[in-house]
Amino acid sequence: MEKLRELLPKDQYEKIAAINNPYLHEFLAEWIEWLEPSKVFVCTDSPEDEEYVRWKALYYGEEKMLEIPKHTVHYDNYYDQARDKTNTKLLVPKGVELPFLNTMNREEGLKEIREIMKGIMRGKELFICFFVLGPTNSIFTIPAVQLTDSAYVAHSEFLLYRKGYEEFKRLGPTKNFFKFVHSAGELDERKTSKNLDKRRIYIDLLDETVYSANTQYGGNTIGLKKLAFRLTIQRAVKEGWLSEHMFLMRVNGPNGRKTYFTGAYPSMCGKTSTAMIPWENIVGDDLVFIKNVDGIARAVNVEIGVFGIIEGVNQKDDPIIWKVLHSPVEIIFSNVLVKDGKPYWNGMGIEIPDEGENHSGKWWRGKRDAEGKEIPPSHKNARFTVRLEAFPNLDREALNNPCGVEVGGMIFGGRDPDTWPPVREAFDWEHGVITMGASLESETTAATLGKEGVRAFNPMSILDFLSVHIGDYIRNYLEFGRKLKKTPKIFAVNYFLRENGRWLNEKLDKAVWLKWMELRVHNDVDAIETPIGYIPRYEDLKVLFKQVLNKDYSREDYEKQFKIRVPELLAKIERIWKIYEPIDNIPEELFKQLKDERERLLKAKAEFGDYISPFTLEKRI
């Protein structure tokens, strides 16, 4: 504490002294001394401290005001627009091998990042902020402390997470907290990170600390988001619960029944549009914790806000998000085009000005970058950051419930033109975890240009964020389900089937699949058994299409969408098998499930041929 007394002005020192936690004090003293900021501000949970951070983001030029009250814009460096996968490394002890993951020797990594960060905050203000992941004072709560010299990063976290200063005071001397140290480094005249050659995001799994330097882009800097996610996955696998890259939503069933679903979809597979269906309710759009509470799987949203991709958001397809983005609620727009105080983005469905300011500086239509590429009005990864409370379809009770909500179903959303049917249900937990979750693929969206895209393997949509061996991750999933008294049903969806280049489904058909899944969770409708799980009966979907979308649904459409495509399904099993086969430590159950599914498909092929009509299988029941 003496060291902190020397380093901090009296008013800021008193805020830290009120937290009785020597581990925290030691960490802060070490890093304040090392970073050498000219000024330190400690954020409590007071509205005044949050307002101070908001004001400093404008004062230091990291954000600018827009025309609508409470709206601001932030720009990242032209070359700092996405997660830096190359320089994001997991620091692991010598000899640890993690397939698919970008690892580095822990001692070397810590030495390098300390050198880069020595004195990096000279002439700058350090913000020390306290937050929690999950609801406060709950079995899901994980406290975290963020050190950053970016008021934009701190402001973003106030929109995305629950405040945690009082929680730190309540918890007292615990080591059970995450630590994030970030510096944007030297800034250029546009107030964006300058030294991108020294951009590093190092995740120390042993000490549950993340270091991030010379970057501002949210995915590299907002400690509690995807950086903390690596730490929570590791902790979940150690402790036997699930930390997942999933939405959490409520589907409204008959007679006021509420059923909650989680959903894991790789990008461009329909995750946000599913969670935002206007007549259902959102709890969260990105990260969930799922724990076994008295034999029931219960889930919480880790966050209280949305850090969403803005590209393509338009009034017709995204009425709720569109309305929020035009309301006077607190929003940070990043890397969009601004003209006369108004933000514009690609695909917004209205005319975009021919000039303005964007992530490249002064912009005009046809402007090219150093590589000769034409610069679009907004970056394809441009974002909006806003609290969930701004959404009229928010299920507030579920968001704030410290016990979480019961998970009725888990959805895995893939993207392919010719393999998975639009919706199906797993035979059981193990079958779903392996053949749906651990086999998830998404066709890269080059497909929309008429080229067949590459199928990217992305189990549980978590590959970019894994921090443990994939075998341990899958084993934990299987074990978690075995210990439940009541397991959630598992479903797989695919909104992107095509035939002769035409989509087989319309955008809103997914609303019908959700209602069918809700009925299946409660065993209200029968289903057809196929070699790959249960699919809907035509009669049930016909009723739902009329009820939900007021649409007629033809037998022909049903047959095209739900036929079992045996050759493509067998090819997929082959692909997935080849990915897992060379890796050590993969649970036996994975190969058994794939083998059993292959045998069921071959048997069906021998009886019915390569392409099997759902009506043929229904007759057999």
Curated annotation (Swiss-Prot):
Catalytic activity: oxaloacetate + GTP = phosphoenolpyruvate + GDP + CO2
Annotated positions binding substrate: 83, 217-219, 267, 381-383
Pathway annotation from the record: Carbohydrate biosynthesis; gluconeogenesis
Cited PROSITE patterns: PEPCK_GTP
Active site feature: 269
Compartment(s) where it occurs, according to its Swiss-Prot or TrEMBL record: Cytoplasm
Cofactor: how and how many bound: Binds 1 Mn(2+) ion per subunit.
GO CC terms in record: cytosol
Listed Pfam families: PEPCK_GTP, PEPCK_N
One GO biological process term: glycerol biosynthetic process from pyruvate
Keywords: Cytoplasm, Decarboxylase, Gluconeogenesis, GTP-binding, Lyase, Manganese, Metal-binding, Nucleotide-binding
Domain of life: Archaea
Function description: Catalyzes the conversion of oxaloacetate (OAA) to phosphoenolpyruvate (PEP), the rate-limiting step in the metabolic pathway that produces glucose from lactate and other precursors derived from the citric acid cycle.
Protein name: Phosphoenolpyruvate carboxykinase [GTP]
Provenance organism: Pyrococcus horikoshii (strain ATCC 700860 / DSM 12428 / JCM 9974 / NBRC 100139 / OT-3)
